[in-house]
């Protein structure tokens, strides 16, 4: 998923390194040629598959353990979507069985957040948890608990699209946002008044009102709070030549902090203040490109611009009559560039082969 913000967030020194391969329709034989790191205190297993709803397509899921801060009262939640397009842990209230402490504003009122994504919004209180993933731990982390019925959604939040606060809508029990930013908003949400993007609310009994939220109290990228291995992530998946029901990979914490997370000669594309870089396709530059494991496909251009027909029943997917082998060029804010090759096959055919709906 990608949080639909155009605000001045605080850019942290995080690196996202995604290593994987994919192809079009054809043989289901997995011809993996890259070696996946599977062991280490900083390695968390992930599965790309159908998720807890059984009908998600191309979702990278993992498990996360949350605890009441400074206690052994903990719960491990499966089916959490790994999302490099956002920052912060967000859990459905329906998946959470332990009671976490509520974050409060200076006047004692509960703090609640409305976070817009391209596909809709999440609404729910900010609570505090210790987070454990693989051998890593972050203490007293502000997280969002989505769809808590104690706090009715204000109109300004509901106007941002459809709610993603149910299992059927989200397709996951939560989101693990490990993107480029230390917080989910940054400096713009600290101040009150004009310029505040209206993400954070304090909610007295009379109703919720927009409030400023300090950087430390905002929903945090948990990776930034690990004691070590806290400067980025590697999302590592095997190469595949055709549709698969599921594949296994690893989420590796840290860049260059252990023997298993070096850059290994990878090209580094730095991003701008919004987390974007430039992708050029057919010599046309698109300067709002981003890496988003929370989206379940490669999203680029419109059918009229790409020349590829869309699916008759799902206009947001392409359905060419034969597999299209294409390429584009990525360029970072640092000027580094490189070509990426990819294939576009009929989404109808691919989904039919693995028994999925258009999700």
Residue ranges and their predicted role:
Residues 96-134, 224-227, 231-358:
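C-terminal catalytic lobe of pepsin-like aspartyl proteases
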Residues 60-71, 76, 120-182, 323-358:
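Aspartyl protease catalytic core from the pepsin/retropepsin fold
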């Amino acid at each position: 998923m990608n949080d639909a913000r155009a605000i001045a967030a605080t850019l942290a020194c995080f690196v996202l390194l995604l290593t994987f391969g994919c192809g079009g329709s054809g043989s289901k034989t997995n011809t993996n040629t890259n070696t996946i790191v599977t062991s280490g205190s900083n390695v968390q297993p992930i599965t790309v598959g159908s998720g807890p709803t059984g009908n998600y397509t191309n979702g990278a899921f993992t498990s996360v353990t949350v605890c009441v801060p400074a206690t052994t009262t903990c719960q491990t939640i499966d089916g959490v979507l790994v999302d490099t397009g956002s920052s912060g842990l967000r859990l459905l209230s329906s998946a959470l069985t332990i009671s976490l402490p509520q974050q409060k504003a200076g006047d004692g009122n509960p703090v609640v957040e409305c976070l817009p994504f391209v596909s809709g919004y999440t609404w729910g209180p900010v609570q505090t948890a210790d987070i454990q993933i693989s051998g890593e731990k972050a203490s007293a982390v502000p997280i969002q608990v989505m769809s808590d019925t104690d706090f009715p959604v204000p109109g300004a939040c509901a106007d941002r699209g459809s709610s993603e606060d149910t299992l059927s809508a989200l397709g996951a029990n939560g989101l693990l946002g490990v993107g480029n930013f230390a917080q989910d908003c940054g400096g713009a949400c600290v101040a009150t008044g004009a310029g505040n993007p209206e993400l954070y609310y304090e909610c007295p009994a009379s109703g919720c009102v927009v409030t400023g939220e300090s950087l430390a109290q905002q929903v945090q990228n948990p990776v930034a709070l690990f004691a070590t291995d806290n400067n980025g992530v590697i999302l590592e998946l095997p190469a595949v030549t055709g549709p698969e029901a599921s594949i296994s990979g690893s989420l590796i914490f840290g860049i260059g902090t252990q023997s298993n997370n070096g850059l290994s000669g990878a090209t580094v594309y730095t991003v701008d203040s919004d987390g974007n870089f430039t992708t050029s396709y057919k010599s046309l530059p698109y300067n709002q490109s981003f890496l988003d494991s929370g989206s379940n496909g490669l999203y680029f251009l419109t059918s009229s611009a790409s020349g590829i027909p869309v699916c008759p029943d799902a206009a947001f997917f392409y359905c060419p009559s034969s597999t299209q082998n294409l390429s584009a060029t990525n360029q970072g804010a640092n000027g580094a560039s490189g070509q990426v090759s990819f294939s576009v096959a009929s989404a109808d055919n691919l989904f039919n082969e693995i028994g999925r709906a258009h999700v």
